[in-house]
Amino acid sequence: MNNFFNNINKEFIMASRSGLEVLMPVMYLFIIMVFFNISISYVDKNIITELLPLMVWMSCLLICVLNLETIFREDYDDGTLDMFIINDRHMERDIIAKIMSHWILSNLPIAIIAPILTIILGLDTDTSFVLFITLLIGTPTMSLIGSIAAALTISLKKNKILVSIIVLPMYIPILIFGTSAVNNSYFNISYNSELIMMIIIFLIFLLVSPIACSKALKISLD
């Protein structure tokens, strides 16, 4: 367990060297939400409020896709991935640490800030809290799914489009359940089944992703 947290701490130190790049996802979200609000300012306020959760979810999904390439890229460039394969016994543990640190640095800030933005833009606090819960479950799931695509395409120089093609269809269930839960909360309908389905998907990929990534990295680096 100590080695796991040591690996996460190492990832944080490496990410801190990138400076403002860590803040880019939050800046993207802020810009998207501002432009969204300006572009439909002529629409009825109630309609805008109903659309806010969907817009947040779509923004988070696209930002997650943009960040996927960075999960293994630096380790691939400096040769650390070769050490992962040599130290095969702990490869899955190292991969999980890398995915978790990527999520904490890239997607967790979005999950925290997005509901605050929706409250500022007029969404009620209860619905914003449900939005936060769905993002807290959905964004790590997207990182787990995306890590598989990133591992499969790591040896390709321009892999962003290919990664997007692979992961976007797999993100659809998360998007459906996430937006449905928030929408149900807005209209005071039970959203428990949607949250349960999101948790099940998360647990499935929490088990599958480390194994799939290790196999994909071995194939890509062969």
Where are these regions (language model features)?
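Hydrophobic alpha-helical transmembrane segments of multi-pass membrane transport/permease proteins
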Residues: G19-I40, M55-C64, I165-F177, I201-S209
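Aromatic- and glycine-rich beta-strand/loop motifs that create alpha-glucan
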Residues: M1-P25
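A structural motif at transmembrane helix-loop-helix junctions in multipass membrane proteins
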Residues: I137-L168, K218-D222
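Hydrophobic alpha-helical transmembrane segments of multi-pass membrane transport proteins
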Residues: L52-I86, M91-I113
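Transmembrane alpha-helical segments of integral membrane proteins
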Residues: I145-I148, P173-S185
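Membrane-interfacial helix-loop-helix connectors in multipass membrane proteins
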Residues: S39-L51, P115-L136, V182-L195
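Junction motif at the cytosolic side of a transmembrane helix
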Residues: L206-D222
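Hydrophobic alpha-helical transmembrane segments that constitute the membrane-spanning cores
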Residues: I31, I96-L121, T141, I145, ...
